[in-house]
């Protein structure tokens, strides 16, 4: 008998069936536990990395205290890394977005970001200078070197290093110290029952920049958001946040937002390539073109990013 089945039996369930919900980009798997009378739960299987269950529980408590909508945890098996959690259904943000619902749904999500930013951050790891650079380094290590087999010459390397340092400095110049979900995008935002927003996959949270989760939401690499509508929502967030942003110009805040997005998308290029090469998950490569599109959109706006454009143009033939 599989350990999950044994655990479910120990919970007192004898009639049930499983269905795979998600085998995501990480080491976690999700199954739907279907009981008689259409009652169901989700089992989060972290058995490949059992210790990861502790951050999930820790961050869950932080978010509940901040009144963020998250799935309830009903039971846990710390030995094997299993959690029995609330089944929120199968409706993600991307499934219900349309021209009519666009702003309403995104504003619901923005309000969840504002609540998350009130969560306790004590003891969480920081999105510091070293980690920002490490993440951006994934692009060269996995996307350029191993996915495209492109090597930069000395001048190109200097140009890339200079641009990455510029991005890092711009990110670090904005207000920090906020709870950061890190993957607050359409596949991690659920809608269940009367339009209630629920947030999932938050266990890798850190402390970071004020724009990070806003970027994850509005510059989502799985769905394209029109820039005019995007900036309208960016400024809605700025207005609602107030406080530390009260004396920040709209132009400056948009610049912070764009450079934060650039950092994130450069990292994602590396992660998608790594998922294919190291983890044998090639499907994510199909999302690289939109990721590159976001990067090029920002390069077109800010002249100081042109050296990055030259590098991307060089590799375009192999991309």
Name each model-derived stretch:
Residues 28-133, 137-138, 148-149, 173:
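ATP-binding pocket architecture of kinase catalytic cores
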Residues 4, 121-126, 130-131, 135-179, ...:
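An alpha-helical support segment within catalytic cores of ATP-dependent transferases
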Residues 140-147, 210-246, 259-279, 291-298:
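Active-site activation/catalytic loop segments of kinase-like enzymes and analogous catalytic loops
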Residues 1-13:
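Juxta-kinase regulatory segment immediately upstream of eukaryotic protein kinase catalytic domains
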Residues 29-34, 116, 166-214, 221-225:
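Active-site acidic catalytic loop and adjacent metal/ATP-binding pocket
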Residues 42, 69, 83, 178, ...:
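Protein kinase-like catalytic core scaffold
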Residues 13-31:
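ATP-binding glycine-rich phosphate-binding loop
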Residues 270-319:
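ATP/Mg2+ or Mg2+-diphosphate-binding catalytic cores
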């Amino acid at each position: 008998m599989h350990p999950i089945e044994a655990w479910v039996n120990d919970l007192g369930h004898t009639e049930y069936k499983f269905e795979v919900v998600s085998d995501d980009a990480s080491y976690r798997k999700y199954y739907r536990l279907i009981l008689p009378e259409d009652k169901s739960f989700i089992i989060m299987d972290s058995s490949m990395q059992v210790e990861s269950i502790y951050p999930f529980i820790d961050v869950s408590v932080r978010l509940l205290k901040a009144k963020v909508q998250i799935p309830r945890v009903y039971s846990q098996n710390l030995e094997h890394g299993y959690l029995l959690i609330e089944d929120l259904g199968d409706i993600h943000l991307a499934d219900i977005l349309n021209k009519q619902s666009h702003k309403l749904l995104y504003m619901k999500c923005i309000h969840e970001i504002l609540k998350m930013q009130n969560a306790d951050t004590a003891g969480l790891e920081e999105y510091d200078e070293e980690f920002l650079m490490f993440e951006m380094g994934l692009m060269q290590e996995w996307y350029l070197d191993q996915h495209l087999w492109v090597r930069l010459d000395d001048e190109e390397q200097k140009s890339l290093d200079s641009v990455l340092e510029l991005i890092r400095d711009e990110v670090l110049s904005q207000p920090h110290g906020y709870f950061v979900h890190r993957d607050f995008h359409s596949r991690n935002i659920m809608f269940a029952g009367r339009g209630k927003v629920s947030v999932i996959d938050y266990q890798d949270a850190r402390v970071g920049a004020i724009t990070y989760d806003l970027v994850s939401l509005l510059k989502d690499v799985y769905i394209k958001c029109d820039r005019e509508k995007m900036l309208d929502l960016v400024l809605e967030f700025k207005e609602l946040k107030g406080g530390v942003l009260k004396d920040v110009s709209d132009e400056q805040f948009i610049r912070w937002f764009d450079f934060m997005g650039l950092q994130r998308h450069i990292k994602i290029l590396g992660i998608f390539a790594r998922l294919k090469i190291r983890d044998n998950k090639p499907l994510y490569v199909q999302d690289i073109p939109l990721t590159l599109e976001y990067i090029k959109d920002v390069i077109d706006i800010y002249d100081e990013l042109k050296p990055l454009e030259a590098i991307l143009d060089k590799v375009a033939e192999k991309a």
